[in-house]
Swiss-Prot record:
Highest taxon of source: Eukaryota
Gene Ontology annotations of biological process type: membrane organization
Name of the coding gene: SH3GLB2
Listed name of the protein: Endophilin-B2
Record-listed N-acetylmethionine modification sites: 1
Length: 395
């Protein structure tokens, strides 16, 4: 108990000394040990890294989960070390509603059939979104969060300790300066009335007394300087580790972009497939009962847009008055053919398209007036339309 009281009194004295030194520095009444320029630049870079990492982390969380209530719920689950429950994505919820609507309104009607097809596509989009959120959380958010909750807390702790060591060092310098000034004054004009009781045997002169004070202050200064230098080196090593943090975050950023690219490619592929499937429904976009010759004024923009074909076909490229263009009669242009590598398997929807296998090489070219999302592909003596998104064009 006595030992604890002594330690408590010692800690209180150290805290008071640091508070006095800090206050005097703020008022310009005490000198302050300045860190070198390189150290200051390391501190500034570390602070900037921390601030921008926080902003990027928060905004990425908003991107992946726009609902603030859901983000708060996930945060609470993480703090309680509990597994975050699986959440239905908006696309999956929309798919569920569309499927239920098709079941109630009639799955055999044009509207019901279309609802079912769109529901399947929305379900695929929701699943792709779920995979993207999961991958981005692991490969990007988790490393950023680990830096803020791990490395940065260690750096902050060592910086606070360095600040305390600097205050101790400057307080020791101030104490030594005062002791030397008092010693010089006592040497010049000895005054035995200034001597005060000590825990050691008093010298017969005030000069000898202040000489002991100077020796003690110099010893304290050496200890404070050693501790400050040691702590400065520890903090410097941690701050220089920010470079490794940047390299790690760069790798994580590449992985995030890779997962985002995959996600959008999957979405685009699903929507292209949906567009082709809807284009095969002849009665999907036309009413069941139409006037034989509707008046021009009764045609609404909605009806006009609904009766438009979903996408161009090779037959659309035929000149007016001629039959549909036959692929076997299409000759490649004299220039403009390129080699392309197939990225994914592709099943031809009709005889005008060319089925593809992943990693095979084909020759591709474009014809005047073709949809920019499609090319003509040749493999041996076979040719047909191929989607651009399934290809990697080679130079």
């Amino acid at each position: 108990m006595d030992f604890n009281m002594k330690k408590l009194a010692s800690d209180a004295g150290i805290f008071f000394t640091r508070a006095v030194q800090f206050t005097e520095e703020k008022f310009g009444q005490a000198e302050k040990t300045e860190l070198d320029a390189h150290f200051e630049s390391l501190l500034a870079r570390a602070d900037s890294t921390k601030n921008w990492t926080e902003k990027i982390l928060r905004q990425t969380e908003v991107l992946l989960q726009p609902n603030p209530s859901a983000r708060v719920e996930e945060f609470l689950y993480e703090k309680l070390d509990r597994k975050v429950p699986s959440r239905v994505t908006n696309g999956e919820l929309l798919a569920q509603y569309m499927a239920e609507a098709a079941s109630e309104l009639g799955p055999t009607t044009p509207y019901g059939k279309t609802l079912i097809k769109v529901a399947e596509a929305e379900k695929h989009l929701g699943a792709a979104e779920r995979d993207f959120i999961h991958t981005a959380s692991i490969n990007f958010l988790t490393p950023l969060r680990n830096f803020l909750e791990g490395d940065w807390k260690t750096i902050s702790k060592e910086r606070r300790l360095l600040q305390n060591r600097r205050l101790d060092l400057d307080a020791s310098k101030a104490r030594l300066k005062k002791a030397k000034a008092a010693e010089a004054k006592a040497t010049t004009v000895p005054d035995f009335q200034e001597t005060r009781p000590r825990n050691y045997i008093l010298s017969a002169s005030a000069s000898a007394l202040w000489n002991d004070e100077v020796d003690k202050a110099e010893q304290e200064l050496r200890v404070a300087q050693t501790e400050f230098d040691r702590q400065a080196e520890v903090t410097r090593l941690l701050l220089e580790g920010i470079s490794s943090t940047h390299v790690n975050h760069l790798r994580c950023l590449h992985e995030f972009i890779e997962s985002q690219t995959t996600y959008y490619a999957q979405c685009y592929r699903h929507m292209l497939d949906l567009q082709k499937q809807l284009g095969r429904f002849p009665g999907t976009f036309v009413g069941t009962a139409e006037p034989a010759s509707p008046p021009l004024s009764s045609t609404s923009p909605t009806t006009t847009a609904a009766t438009m074909p979903m996408g161009p076909s090779v037959a659309d490229l035929a000149p007016p008055g001629e039959a549909a263009l036959r692929l076997e009669e299409v000759a490649p242009p004299a220039s403009g053919t390129r080699k392309a590598r197939v990225l994914y398997d592709y099943e031809a929807a009709d005889s005008s398209e060319l089925a593809l296998l992943a990693d095979e090489l084909i020759t591709v070219y474009s014809l005047p007036g073709m949809d920019p999302d499609w090319l003509i592909g040749e493999r041996g003596n076979k040719k047909g339309k191929v989607p651009v998104t399934y290809l990697e064009l080679l130079s």
